Every structure is written in C-alpha cells, then in structure tokens.
C-alpha cells in the first residue's frame, strides 16, 4: 500500500498494467484518459469492470492505470488482472469470489513463435506430390 492507494500489477499476452486504487467515486483513468475514451469498444470496458461488478465495488474506488504493450484486448485483460490484484491487496476477503470467477489466475496463453520452413507457427507450405 502506497499512502492510501492499493496497488496491483496485471499482465495479459504482451500487455502490462500497473493499477492503483483508492476509495472514491468510481472514476477509472487509463493512461490519463477516462476508460470510455481509452477503450473504444464496449467489450474492453466490460472486461475492465468485471471484478468491480462481481465484488459490488463499481462506484466505490477511484482507479489510476498505466498500461503498455499489446493490443486493445490484451490491455483490457491486463487491466482486469491488475484491478483484481489491487482489490485483493485492499481486502483479502474478496479473493475467494474473484478466484472462483477466474480473475486471479494469470492467463498464460502467449503467441506461439513462427518456425523455420513454415508459413506461420504451424501452417506449413502446401505439399505437392508431383
């Protein structure tokens, strides 16, 4: 805890989010912009708010987020993971509910590397018999 802020780091794919929460009115600021402005798609905003809705703290915290790397979906997932960890830092009693919903676990799926002689990670060149 830094002063009256609680902190959580979230990661998803290549995105990393540093999340700071404190008691407040429910404002979420991502990289200096309101969450509605930063995440253009509705799905991104929904993903970010999931842990707050689950715990019933949607209007209870002011949240500041710094996020970098990856794309929109990866960043939304990283912010969700960071908010979850910050909520657990604030109140450890919330962990079972968040864990049950699957928000505590870091999604370990990463992009598979492209292999030599293949077009993509697994897509091979077309085989010609003759």
Curated annotation (Swiss-Prot):
GO molecular function: RNA binding; structural constituent of ribosome
GO BP term, pick one: translation
Pfam families, A to Z: Ribosomal_S9
Entry keyword set: Ribonucleoprotein, Ribosomal protein
Similarity section: Belongs to the universal ribosomal protein uS9 family.
InterPro entries the record matches: Ribosomal_Su5_D2-typ_SF, Ribosomal_uS9, Ribosomal_uS9_bac/plastid, Ribosomal_uS9_CS, Ribsml_uS5_D2-typ_fold_subgr
Coiled-coil parts of chain: none
Gene Ontology CC entries for this record: cytosolic small ribosomal subunit
Recorded superkingdom: Bacteria
Protein name, entry field: Small ribosomal subunit protein uS9
Naturally occurring in which organism (per UniProt): Bordetella parapertussis (strain 12822 / ATCC BAA-587 / NCTC 13253)
């Amino acid at each position: 805890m830094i002063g009256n802020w609680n902190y959580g780091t979230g990661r998803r794919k290549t995105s990393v989010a540093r999340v700071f929460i404190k008691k407040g009115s429910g404002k979420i600021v991502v990289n200096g912009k309101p969450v509605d402005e930063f995440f253009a798609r509705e799905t991104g905003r929904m993903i970010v708010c999931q842990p707050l809705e689950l715990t019933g703290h949607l209007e209870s915290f002011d949240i500041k987020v710094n996020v970098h790397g990856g794309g929109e979906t990866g960043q939304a997932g990283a912010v969700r993971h960071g908010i979850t960890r910050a909520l657990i830092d604030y109140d450890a009693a919330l962990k079972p509910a968040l864990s049950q919903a699957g928000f505590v676990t870091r999604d370990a799926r990463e992009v598979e590397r492209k292999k030599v002689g293949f077009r993509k990670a697994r897509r091979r060149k077309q085989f010609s018999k003759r």
